[in-house]
């Protein structure tokens, strides 16, 4: 558990409740979220949005678009509750509506990253963001 907390803290600059998002990505993919997704493509981790380089990067693009729809809380900082039940993410029912939305955005990106593990390409692990092409609209 301590390792997950350290990984989440290292995700500084990544949008979303860092601790929850990092844990979800690890639980769904088995991958270290900082090492594998912190600088991946044009949309994962820190940096601006750009045209996705592959399906993995598209997951992060959709995640950032999901956050743009959130109102009433700060998806970058505000924490929410969720549980891991039978290998599935369950957003807490006691979360206020805004944080429920943030949790669902984070859940969706974690599942998307798992579903697209086959498209993950180590050559995109560290992408120079200013070389990314203009992003599509959400």
UniProtKB/Swiss-Prot annotation:
Biological process, per Gene Ontology: arachidonate secretion; lipid catabolic process; phospholipid metabolic process
Site note Important residue of the cationic membrane-docking site (MDoS), residues: 122, 125
GO cellular component, one term: extracellular region
Site for Cationic membrane-docking site (MDoS), residues: 129
Presence of keyword Secreted: yes
UniProt signal peptide: 1-16
Tissue localization of expression: Expressed by the venom gland.
Any one Gene Ontology molecular-function term assigned to this protein's record: toxin activity
Keyword ATP-binding: no
PANTHER family given in the database record: BASIC PHOSPHOLIPASE A2 PA-11-LIKE, PHOSPHOLIPASE A2 FAMILY MEMBER
Name of the molecule in the record: Basic phospholipase A2 homolog G6K49
Organism annotation: Calloselasma rhodostoma (Malayan pit viper)
């Amino acid at each position: 558990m301590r390792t997950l907390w350290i990984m989440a803290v290292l995700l500084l600059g990544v949008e979303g409740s860092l601790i929850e998002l990092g844990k979800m990505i690890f639980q769904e993919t088995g991958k270290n979220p900082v090492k594998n997704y912190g600088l991946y493509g044009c949309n994962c981790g820190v940096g601006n949005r750009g045209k996705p380089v592959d399906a993995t990067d598209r997951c992060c693009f959709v995640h950032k678009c999901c956050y743009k729809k959130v109102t009433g809380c700060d998806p970058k900082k505000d924490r929410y509750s969720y549980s891991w039940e039978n290998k599935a993410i369950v957003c807490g029912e006691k979360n206020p509506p805004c944080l429920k939305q943030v949790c669902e955005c984070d859940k969706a990106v974690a599942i998307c990253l798992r579903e697209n593990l086959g498209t993950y390409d180590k050559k995109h692990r560290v992408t120079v963001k200013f070389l990314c092409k203009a992003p599509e609209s959400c």
